[in-house]
Amino acid sequence: MGLTKNFAFLVFCCQRYCSMDGEAFEISLLDGEEDRFGGTVVNLMEVESMTIGDFDSKLDVSLKAWKDQGKKGIWIKLPSELSSLVDTAIKKGFTYHHAENEYVMLTFWLPEPPSTLPCNASHRIGIGAFVLNKNGEMLVVQENSGYFKDKNVWKVPTGTIKEGESIWAGAVREVKEETDIDAEFVEVLSFMESHQAVWQRKTDIFFVCELEARTFEIQKQDSEIHAAKWMPVEEYVNQPYHNKEGNEMFKLIANICLKRSREKYTGFVLTTNSAKKSLYCSVDHANLLKETADQASTSLSD
């Protein structure tokens, strides 16, 4: 039994061929790890060098072996140093999946289509910060660039969540970067989906967060912000921009901010937070969850 397993391992690690003059030679397979879904992940990030010819021959025998093994999705992670190998993989049927600064990920679905491989990142996460001071005024900015440049529109500080960053932390960071205001996260008021918003393909999810200001003296970020100030909430809501056709979503968000400033609206508070996970729920249930955290889950059914 053990001998059979070892023989199978050797067969799948390399293939033996004969040269034109009859001499035998072996071509090793690309080193890959099986994933949870019956596929194989080939990580070449630690490979210092590989010629196109060597990669071509190894990929040929690897694809044959993977098909014989009944593998499904094949993933190849190529570092930028081996970018010359991309064309070879594409010609054999691989497609681009995603790329980062230091690598490109290629995929190949071996069974009959359709492929069930997940797409790359489908959404971008943005935040808008509704920041109130002790006088009930809100923090607003005008931008140096982007869609709102030269439109004379006052808007809340906005930005994009960084990789590995929580929504609440991103809101606090953006406010600090753009206005130098220290603020404390209160709750998520609402969120909006905008399809085909990123490169005319990806969806943008925009979270509106309420923050409470802890400092009040504004120092704008010169590189991105044209102007910043504290403004009465009603004045912000009544800007002509919010009443223009096509801007209904912006008007709804502005009205949510107005209702929240009058304490007639509640959103989602941060109930638990760890290094990798954050849970938000309605204010009405937050205290209940904290009170019953140690109870059996069946006791929460009411």
UniProtKB/Swiss-Prot annotation:
Gene3D superfamilies: 3.40.630.30, Nucleoside Triphosphate Pyrophosphohydrolase (3.90.79.10)
Cofactor: Mg(2+); Mn(2+)
Membrane-spanning intervals of the chain: none
Hydrolase listed as a keyword: yes
PROSITE patterns reported in the protein's UniProt record: NUDIX, NUDIX_BOX
Keyword Calcium set for record: no
Known tissue expression: Expressed in roots, stems and leaves.
Chain positions of motif Nudix box: 159-180
Enzyme Commission (EC) number: 3.6.1.-
UniProt cross-references to InterPro entries, sorted A to Z: NUDIX_hydrolase-like_dom_sf, Nudix_hydrolase6-like, NUDIX_hydrolase_CS, NUDIX_hydrolase_dom, Pre-Nudix
Domain Nudix hydrolase: 122-254
CDD domains (alphabetical): NUDIX_ASFGF2_Nudt6 (cd04670)
Binding site for Mg(2+): 174, 178
GO MF term (any one): metal ion binding
Official protein name in the record: Nudix hydrolase 5
Organism: Arabidopsis thaliana
